Amino acid sequence: MSITAQSVYRDTGNFFRNQFMTILLVSLLCAFITVVLGHVFSPSDAQLAQLNDGVPVSGSSGLFDLVQNMSPEQQQILLQASAASTFSGLIGNAILAGGVILIIQLVSAGQRVSALRAIGASAPILPKLFILIFLTTLLVQIGIMLVVVPGIIMAILLALAPVMLVQDKMGVFASMRSSMRLTWANMRLVAPAVLSWLLAKTLLLLFASSFAALTPEIGAVLANTLSNLISAILLIYLFRLYMLIRQ
């Protein structure tokens, strides 16, 4: 059977519209979890204020130079802030991926679904999803730090891994290997969707500061919710595409 991107886009749009409230609630819950965890594990405001003390920002040629000019205590605060942001983001993304994929599975099986039921049903696979998303994020970030293009290629090649891990109950590394092989064979169907997702996330990041006009916390929840909705659309597309490829 010939698969066209247009038909998969249409199916994705229909599913997203029909399950919008459930997906919105999952996205909102994941955003709230991300923001709360980030706040809990982040340094205090007083500690963050120390990062600006005695650091010559204008004279620093780059990030590494800036970090080298910091005191050991400031470097520790920066490391804690970075780790808190990364950890909370990974937790939120793992719950989002598990919740959205379980919504698709339950709806496809003709069952009634709610946001809490989908997240609860995804609990057994969350540890593997967390490890998978951590490794994927690490590889993509390393690729982007090198020449940007390798990172984008890795993001495309590993896009199907979460779907395969949940749907076929694969291991972390098995899903990564299988995703690379299957995506490479269907690059014309996967690449445009992932590139559109990256572009949408980048545009959202550029306008994220405008959300802080409300309050930093509410702005962070709103920005994360929109980001989660964008990721949910990609997951729906990839799930539908994967099921068509397997037929």
UniProtKB/Swiss-Prot annotation:
Residues 1-19, 108-117, 173-186, 246-247 are cytoplasmic. The chain crosses the membrane at residues 20-40, 87-107, 118-140, 152-172, 187-209, 225-245. Changing I233V: In strain: ECOR 31, ECOR 46, ECOR 50, ECOR 52 and ECOR 60. One of its GO terms (cellular component) is plasma membrane. Its main location: membrane. It is a multi-pass membrane protein. Keywords: Cell inner membrane, Cell membrane, Membrane, Transmembrane, Transmembrane helix. InterPro entries: UPF0259 (IPR009627). It holds the Pfam family UPF0259. Residues 41-86, 141-151, 210-224 are periplasmic. Changing I119V: In strain: ECOR 60. It comes from the Bacteria. It is found in: Cell inner membrane. Changing V26I: In strain: ECOR 52. Changing V172I: In strain: ECOR 16, ECOR 28, ECOR 31, ECOR 37, ECOR 50 and ECOR 71. Belongs to the UPF0259 family. This is UPF0259 membrane protein YciC.
